[in-house]
UniProtKB/Swiss-Prot annotation:
Major location category of this protein: cytoplasm
GO biological process terms held by the UniProt record: chemical synaptic transmission; neuropeptide signaling pathway; sensory perception
Organism name: Felis catus
Gene designation: PENK
UniProt modification remark: The N-terminal domain contains 6 conserved cysteines thought to be involved in disulfide bonding and/or processing.
Pro-sequence residue ranges: 52-70, 80-143, 153-163, 173-187
Family assignment from sequence similarity: Belongs to the opioid neuropeptide precursor family.
Name of the featured protein: Proenkephalin-A
Amino acid sequence: WETCKEFLKLSQLEIPQDGTSALRESSPEESHALRKKYGGFMKRYGGFMKKMDELYPQEPEEEAPAEILAKRYGGFMKKDAEEEEDALASSSDLLKELLGPGETETAAAPRGRDDEDVSKSHGGFMRALKGSPQLAQEAKMLQKRYGGFMRRVGRPEWWMDYQKRYGGFLKRFADSLPSDEEGESYS
């Protein structure tokens, strides 16, 4: 039914006989208000936007969403909004508590008291800790480890297993197998 009603509204708009749009003939105050409301888009889409504004007036929900939600849902959404604000406030308080007193202002500046604090430097490397061994152990577990590749020294374990399994079969009979160096080939 809504689409039919909209179609009737559109068909009832009067279009002047001279071919100009009735929407463009407006007072300068209205055009100034529309330019202020829509900005630079009025140059290109002005007539369309004005027509849409007439057909679909702005709903009161867009003007005051919190009040409408409170009325519509009986305060349910209002409670959620208040809880989100409380959560943001508590998280910022927690962050301030973790940073400690006086460090919120100087968080971006480099610190001079490395021996007192656990501080990060250069992309996540933890500096050495001086203090309780328990705190040092916890920080070591969290420490990021970046570095070079590990280099294997000696034979790999799978090679030893391979030698045990085949009992050195290839070593025993390596002399009796034809080699490519001797030039012997089977045709």
